[in-house]
């Protein structure tokens, strides 16, 4: 019974585990700096099997980006016509993919969430915020539950908003 109580006390951190083996304490002192390129790292002693596998990876790595290289999203079209603004009226969160696809193509999206349940609308706004962050766009609240998502290469000015409002895009609340 005392063994079970001792194990519980060790688990809760109330006492130290006496069974700690100090022979292995210095095993993790050497660390690899992952910021250095692979060629500059000190090589370890490897078995021939590991070396052959490493050579195969090295040969194919000439065409692939390195692990430390940052990837940027695919560039959107250079110019986006404001006449291509897409207005979507999602009813469920499952329609988030459509919003993402249009936005990723560089098309400004007006999200009208008035027909959605509040919990799903909040999830969709969170999705849109992640989309905006990931693709360097901007999001504006037009009215209650209506949002304009603009890609990075598109700037919607007040004049453009007025022109869009005349056509009825913003008057959907």
Swiss-Prot record:
Its main location: cytoplasm. One of its GO terms (biological process) is division septum assembly. Residues 31-82 are annotated as: Disordered. Residues 39-53, 60-72 have a biased composition (Basic and acidic residues). The keyword Cell cycle applies. One of its GO terms (cellular component) is cytoplasm. It is found in: Cytoplasm. Keywords: Cell cycle, Cell division, Cytoplasm, Septation. Homodimer. Interacts with FtsZ. Belongs to the SepF family. HAMAP family: SepF. Cell division protein that is part of the divisome complex and is recruited early to the Z-ring. Probably stimulates Z-ring formation, perhaps through the cross-linking of FtsZ protofilaments. Its function overlaps with FtsA. PANTHER family: CELL DIVISION PROTEIN SEPF. This is Cell division protein SepF. It comes from Thermobifida fusca (strain YX).
